[in-house]
Amino acid sequence: MARNHERKKRVRKQIPADVEVTVANNTDGMFEYQSPNKVLTLSMEKYGDEEFVNFEDLRQLKRYLEDFSLVIVDVNSDEYSVIDIARSLRVNRSYEEYFKSILGLSDEEMEEEYDIDLEELDDFILDSTLGEYKVQLEGRIKKTIIERSVALYREGELNDYSKLQALKATRPVDERETFLDYVKG
């Protein structure tokens, strides 16, 4: 029973369908989505492009939000934080990992985050220790870490040999030798 008092259960808030959320393309290229009923269409041409989506439509994008291909970058309401939206969509584990591991926030601080700056992920990739970087290469948002690392390498910003070796290790064995040459083009 003492354990229950130590761990405070996070309550999933009821989010109104009309709450507007800003999502950003977190892929190295174009992101397009059209719902099966053709009610929701998103077209973002490059990394960082943003679109407004109401919470009701956001449910259709759940898998993209979970793997961080799309990121909730702003909640246009003072009543709900990014983690509130993520919890309601049941993609909170990825967002909790981002807030705790990438930004180093506590549970309480995470509750107060109303926006996400995509550049913070790039800063983490460039400034983290090798150990921190390797942990994220195996975490919930590894696809995004790998994709952003490749983009930063192409742009000449990521040149840490140890991180590049860790990045290569994520590839199948037969691709590792030529991976960085292939990425550089």
Q: Model regions: which residues?
A:
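Charge/polar-rich, low-complexity and marginally structured segments
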Residues: 98-185
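Compact, well-ordered interaction domains used in eukaryotic information-processing assemblies
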Residues: 7-98
